[in-house]
Amino acid sequence: MSKEIIWQPSKELIENSKLTKFIQYCNLKNYDELEKKSFSDPGWLWDNVIKFSDLKFYKPYSKILDDSKGIPWTRWCIEGKTNIVLNCIDRHKDREFFKNTFIYAEREDGKESSITYEEFDKQISKVGNTLKINGFKKGDVIALYMPQFIETYIAYFAILKIGCVVLPLFSGYGSKAVIERLNIAKAKGIFTVEKTFRKAKEIRMFDQIKNELDQVISLEKIFLFGKEKGNKIFNWENFQNVSDNLKTEETDAEDPAIIHFTSGTTGKPKGCVYTHIGLVAKMSFDEGVLADFKQTDIHLCMADMGWMVGSKSATIASAHGAQMVIAEGVPDFPDEVRFWKLIEKYKVSWTELSPALIRAQMIKDEKLFKDLDLSSLRMICTGGEPWTEKPWKWLFQVIGKSKVPIMNSAGGTEVSGSILHCCLHRPFKVGSFNAPIPGMSADILNLDGQKVSTNEMGELVMRKSSIGLTKSLWNDDKRYIDNYWSVIKDYWVHGDLASRDADGHWYLHGRSDDTIKVSGKRIGPSELESVIVKSGKAKEVAAVGIPDANKGSKIILSIVPAENNDQKESFFEDLVIKDLGKSFKPDKVIFVKDLPKTRNMKIMRRVIKSCLANQDPGDLSTLLNPESVEEIRSHAI
């Protein structure tokens, strides 16, 4: 990766940025002072963020934080009463822009629709009233299994408005993945649709799960955008017969609002919990202050609501009273440059995208980009995985015309935003992060808890809690401590390998665990492996991700077949597609006699991954069966 300075902020940009206004609000001289003070006192930082962003409370908080039970259990905005909907919708009602368009939406076939803030407010009240009529109450979990429709956002905010907890699920999940998450969360309701389209293929979303929903004992109601009738089904059209007048529920600032599942390397999916104050405060700072998002911006991020970025997008735009563009389907169909044409058409000023999208776009015919007018773009935010030099420069030069700053960020579902970012007051290097996010107390340590040297890799950690940090894991306090606060005792260990150069620029070098990320979507090996094992056609299986230039990782399944198994590779590919969705289809299935294991029978995915990537597997002295390595190596990609 090139280490030269490639972008410099202008004096005008610095002077007019929200970051400068925030620094002045805090009575500080510059970003260096902000960074230093917030590192030692994150409570001071978040108190100022809340006040600067004019976040509203029904009852003011008496104290910004309480960490008396230990840093992992830090509580925020003590005794405060609020609601995400209060800060994303209600507080805008007296503003002129409330009659303006909030969401522009396009279906894959090009059909357009839109909704104003005023209309949106009435619709979420109708849906919220219906939920209450059907017996849903504060604290109940209601899932969203929907594509990028306006109705998805209406349901999302309606659930929050009545104090229920929203559980967004990736619209590409198969039935097993959906049912497992519904059961972990003990969901009482689910919003879904009859169908959507992806690359001209009709996806029958409700059909994919309806025959398995009886496995969710807690489920009481299905809210369906479609015409199918049934015992538990409430059809979307019936929402229109309900009152559009509904008071927003007053919730404790720390009440659960959103559950986003993320996958680790072992065990069941982990439910990260966002609070009513946590996400909106984090987005107000990360995107509003640091990435300069304003009420006049138009936002586009083609992310599924099932991922953290979906909640992030909904909150960024609405909390600022801005406009957003959503689109059914994918960024490169039916037009190869659909994503950029959406920016051109709607004059998008602020977009968020992944390196995976750019790797796919940069190999297309350069003529496709020649006549695009992307002059409305003033900010490009990126995240999800580390950059390599060539795609970063392509984005900067071809799309941004070497003028638009690329706001690289790194964080994740567990922190509801970023730990590292690019500060608009400092120069940018290719693919780097020129600063840690204030209020995150970020550092790089070795496993002994010691700071690493310049350019040395170590674990990305947080020394203190953050307002947006997950409130434990849903119904799993032990796993929360074991996974995040015990690797290096009393530090949050994020699972990313990081380094810092002599100029203070930070870099990521991939995950320090075995989580597989495909085009920005994360999945744990155990989820893939369990699908194969339960078929009875495999004795053992190991799922690993091999680096891929286009989508981040290729999924490779190494299978020890069951006796008398005559199934082909396609059989196992189809199993994964059915249960987990097409996004996680294996790129290759290999059959082997044995898998490398330690003496306590732990499968060594690190060794398998290295062999398949044709790399040195390192120390094999702990292996029970080192002879298995050569067979794996013979299948190297």
Annotate the PLM regions:
Residues 435-439, 450-484, 523, 537, ...:
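Conserved ATP/PPi-binding loop(s) of AMP-dependent carboxylate-activating enzymes
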Residues 170-195, 344, 351, 466, ...:
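AMP-binding/adenylate-forming catalytic core of the ANL superfamily
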Residues 33-36, 85-86, 99, 103-157, ...:
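Conserved AMP-binding/adenylate-forming core of the ANL superfamily
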Residues 161-237, 563:
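Structural core segment of the AMP-binding/adenylate-forming
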Residues 319-322, 349-353, 362-428, 441:
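Gly/Ser/Thr-rich phosphate-binding loop
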Residues 99-101, 224, 240-261, 268, ...:
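Conserved pre-ATP/AMP-binding loop-to-beta segment of ANL
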Residues 113-118, 257-283:
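Conserved AMP-binding A3 loop
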